[in-house]
Amino acid sequence: MIYTSNEICQMFLNFFYKKGHTILPGSTLIPNNDPSLLFTNSGMNQFKDIFIQKNYNFKYNRVTTLQNCLRTGGKHNDFENVGYTPQHHTFFQMLGNFSFRDYFKLDAILYAWKFLTSKEQLNLSKEKLWITVYQDDLESYNIWKNIIKIDKHKIIKIGNKYNSSDSDNFWQMGEIGPCGPCTEIFYDYGNTLPGTIPGNNGCNVPRFVEIWNIVFIQFNKLSNGKLIKLTESYVDTGMGLERISAVINNVTSNYEIDLFKPLIKHILELSTVNTPKNKSIYVIADHIRACSFIISENIIPSNEKHGYVLRRIIRRAIRHGHNLGIKSLFLHKLIPTLINTMGKFNPVLKKQQNKIENVLKLEEQKFIETLEKGLKLLHKELKQIQPKHVLSGKLAFNLYDTFGFPIDLTIDICKEHNISINIMEFKRYLNQHKQNSINKNFLNTRNAYYIEDNNINIKTHFVGYQFNKTQSIINNIIIKNNKKTLQINDYQNSILFLNETPFYGESGGQIGDSGIIHNKTGKFIVNCTKMFGNIIGHVGTLASGYLNIHDTVCAEINLPKRKSIQINHTATHLLHASLRKILGKHVFQKGSFISDQSLKFDFSHNAPMNLREIQEVENIINKKIQKNISVSTTLTTLQEIQNKKVMALFQDKYKDKVRMISINDFSVELCGGTHTKYTGDIGLFKITSEISISSGIRRIEAVTGKHAISIIHHQEKTINNIANMLNSKTNNIEQTITKLLNNNIHLKKQIYTLYNQNIYNIVNSLSKHNILIKDVNIIIKNLKNENLLSLRNIVDKLKNRFKCSVIIISSIINNKSIIIVGVTRNVTDRISALDILNKLTKKLGGRGGGKNNIAEGGIKNLISLPIELKKIKTWISSRL
C-alpha cells in the first residue's frame, strides 16, 4: 500500500506511542546548549546530555520524535552531493525512537522489524531487507539470525576501516566518551539497478539504500582506546522520512515523493526547461526547504556562522535557478507551495511566511546584481583551463570578495567542468582579508601600547564595581620603548600598573576610565585605562612631582565620566533587548563602542530600520527608563545559566564565574562592564543614526541624558530657523514646504516650456542660414550665451530637419567658447565630424573629441573664431 509522507510519520509516532513511548517535539534546528554544533543534524542531539550522563533528571524512559535536521559541513556533510544523488539533502526529517536505561537490543530490533514488515504497518517485503552489524556485536547478529530469522547471507558483518579504529557500524560521539555498535537496515530495490551489497565499498546507491540505523550505546571509550562497559545502556535510532517514503512509494529517488513533487512542479513552471529530472531543479527543491526552516528560526543571511550557511544555500539555489533560465527573483514564490506540502507538521512555516519571503527577496536582490558578472568572469577563466587542472585560489577569492560567490558555489561550478580549485591559496587570501578587516574595524582596534608578558608579572585586582577610589601600590612603571623604570619625574607618557585599582580597563566595547593617581610627592593624570591581557594599565602623564615604584598612592576615577559611561552601557542593554522585540530574535550584538558621550551598537539585521521601528525602539527604552527599574548584578557560572534565557557573546571567552546583568526579565545578559543602579538614571534615550556597515550588519548611534536633550534642543533650533526662513510657524512647516515644492515644480515646467520655445526659435533662425553644396546642407553659426546642453539639442534638431547635413555650432559663454560639429551618417563616408573639429582646434587652439557623426570641444582663440568658421566652409566644400 502507498502512503504519504505525513501518513508514514503519523504511523511511526503512533506505533511507538503504543509501545510506551512519549511523543516529544523535535528540538530547534539551532541547538540551544551545544556550541559544538551549528545545526541539529540528528534526532539524538537534544538527548546528548542524557547519553553522556550529564542529565539524570530526564523523566522519560522511552521517547519518539520527528526531528528537523540540517547537514552542510563537518563529518556529516551532504551539501556537495545534493542534487547529484537521489538520497542526499541539506534539510531532512528524521524519525527516531529512544530508550534511556530501558529496553535494549532485542526490543529495539523487534520494534523496527515489526514496524517495517507487519501488515498493520508498512508491510515491506522481508525478502527486500538486508542487515549490517558490527563484527564484534554477536548479540545483535544472533537476534537477526535466530529470532528474526534473517538468512545469514543477508546479515553483513562490518569491521573497522583499513588501518583505523573507526567503523561505519560503531557509533562514537567523539575520541572519548559514550559509544557502541549499531545495526543498519537496508532496502534492496532489485538487480535491475546497479550497486553492490551493503558493506562492499560503502554500499553504492541506488540499489541498496539504508533506511534505519539502530545505535546501542553501551560503552565508554577511554583515551587509550579501551572500551569500558556502561552500567546503564541506551538506544538511539534514526530513520530518514524522505528515504522510507521513497521506498514505500516504490521510487528510487527521494525527489519523486510527495514532499518534493509540488515544489518540483512549481520550479518547472518558473523555468525554461521541459523535464523535472534535472539536477538544478533538485538543488532548488532541496535548498528552499533548508532556507525556509533556517529563516523560521530567526537566522538571516550574513558572513558568519549560521547566517553564512544560510547565505551559501540561498546563493547556490539562485545560481541553479540561473541554470534553468530563471532571471528574475523566484525563491520567495515557492514558499506557499512549501507550506502546503510541509505545513501540517511544521506550523512555524505559515507563522513566519512573510518573514521567510522577505528575507529571500532581499538576499536574491543582493546576489542577482553580481551573479551575471561573476559567472561571466569564471566561465571566461574556465575556458582557458584544461579539464582535471586547477583554478587559482586568488580568482576564487576574487569571486568571493567582489561578487559574493561562496567558495562551495565556485567549487560546484568547477566540478561541472571537471576542474578543481587551489583551496589552500583561497584560504590564504581569505585569512589575510579577515585580518585586514579586524585591523580596520574601530570596534576591534588593538591597544596603542605593546607590553611584553614577561615585563609585567603581577595581576591587578579590580575593585571598580564597589569603589570609585582606593589606596593602592605601584607595582610597575613602563615608559616608551617598553622600558621599565623605577621612577617617573618628567612629563612623558607612561603606564602605571597597580596592585589594586577602581579604573575599568577598556574591554567589552566600553572605554576605559580616566582620573588621577596621586600621593604627597606626585600627581599622575590617567587619560585612558587599557587591558594588557589580564593586567590593567593606567595610561597617562605625570602632572607634577614624581612617583616611585612600590609607592602607596590613591587611585581615583573621574566619577562624572564613569557615571556617563555606566548610563550608556545600561542603555545599550536596553537597546539590544528592544531591537530583538521589534525586529525579531535574529538580532544579535556584533560589536559596540560605549563612551561617556554616546554609544554605538552593531547588530545583525538585513534591512534599514524605518522611522516607525526606530521610534518604537525609543519608546520601549524610554518607558523602561521612566519605570526606574533596578539593574541587578549576579555572580554565577556558565553551567548555571545554560537553561536560562541569558544573552551572551559566545565568541567571547568567559571565565568560570560570570556577571549576569538583569533589568527585570526584559534584559538578561552576561557582561563585565559597569552599569547604573536604576534605569531612571539614564534620563532620556535618543537614536541619532542607523546605518549599514557591512552586509547584514547595521549600526545604531545613540545618546542619553543631557546629550539626548542637547540633540533635541539642536533639532528644535533647526526647525525654528527653517520656520523663520520660510516666514512660517513651526507647526505649519510641512505645509509651507509642500507649497514651495509644488510652486517649484510649476516654475520648472514653465522654464522647460520657454527653453524648448527658445531652442525651436534658434533652430528656425539657423535653418535660414542653410547653404546647399552638392546634396549636403551646411549650417555654420556662432551663438552667444548658449550652454553645451543647448548646443547639443540644437545640433540634434537641425540634423533631424536636414537629413543630409553638416552642422557646426559654437557659442561664447563666460569668455569661453564651446563648439559642436554634427554630420549625418549618410555623409560620414565623405567627411568626419571629428576631422572638422580637429582642423578648427589646430588653428584656434583647444581640444576636443568625438566620433565621425558627432564631435565637441573647446576653443582658445575667440577673436579668430568667426574667420576660421568662414574658412572651414570652403574646406568642407572641397571634401564633398
From Swiss-Prot:
Q: Which PANTHER family match?
A: ALANINE--TRNA LIGASE, CYTOPLASMIC (PTHR11777:SF9), ALANYL-TRNA SYNTHETASE (PTHR11777)
**What is this protein's gene name?**
alaS
Catalyzed chemical reaction(s):
tRNA(Ala) + L-alanine + ATP = L-alanyl-tRNA(Ala) + AMP + diphosphate
Record: residues binding Zn(2+): H569, H573, C671, H675
Q: Where in the cell is it found?
A: Cytoplasm
Cross-referenced CDD domains: AlaRS_core
The protein's required cofactor(s) are namely: Zn(2+)
User: Is the Cell inner membrane keyword given for this protein?
Assistant: no
Name of the protein? Alanine--tRNA ligase
Cited NCBIfam families: alaS
Supply one GO BP term. Answer: alanyl-tRNA aminoacylation
Give the protein's function. Catalyzes the attachment of alanine to tRNA(Ala) in a two-step reaction: alanine is first activated by ATP to form Ala-AMP and then transferred to the acceptor end of tRNA(Ala). Also edits incorrectly charged Ser-tRNA(Ala) and Gly-tRNA(Ala) via its editing domain.
Q: What is the superkingdom listed in this entry's lineage?
A: Bacteria
- Subunit comment: Homotetramer.
Question: Which key words are in the record?
Answer: Aminoacyl-tRNA synthetase, ATP-binding, Cytoplasm, Ligase, Metal-binding, Nucleotide-binding, Protein biosynthesis, RNA-binding, tRNA-binding, Zinc
- Protein EC: 6.1.1.7
Q: Record's domain comment?
A: Consists of three domains; the N-terminal catalytic domain, the editing domain and the C-terminal C-Ala domain. The editing domain removes incorrectly charged amino acids, while the C-Ala domain, along with tRNA(Ala), serves as a bridge to cooperatively bring together the editing and aminoacylation centers thus stimulating deacylation of misacylated tRNAs.
Q: Name one GO cellular component term.
A: cytosol
Q: Which InterPro entries match?
A: aa-tRNA-synth_II/BPL/LPL, Ala-tRNA-lgiase_IIc, Ala-tRNA-ligase_IIc_anticod-bd, Ala-tRNA-synth_IIc_core, Ala-tRNA-synth_IIc_N, Ala-tRNA_ligase, Ala_tRNA_ligase_euk/bac, DHHA1_dom
Family that this chain belongs to:
Belongs to the class-II aminoacyl-tRNA synthetase family.
Drop me one GO molecular function for this one.
zinc ion binding
Cofactor binding note from Swiss-Prot or TrEMBL: Binds 1 zinc ion per subunit.
Show the disulfide pairing.
none
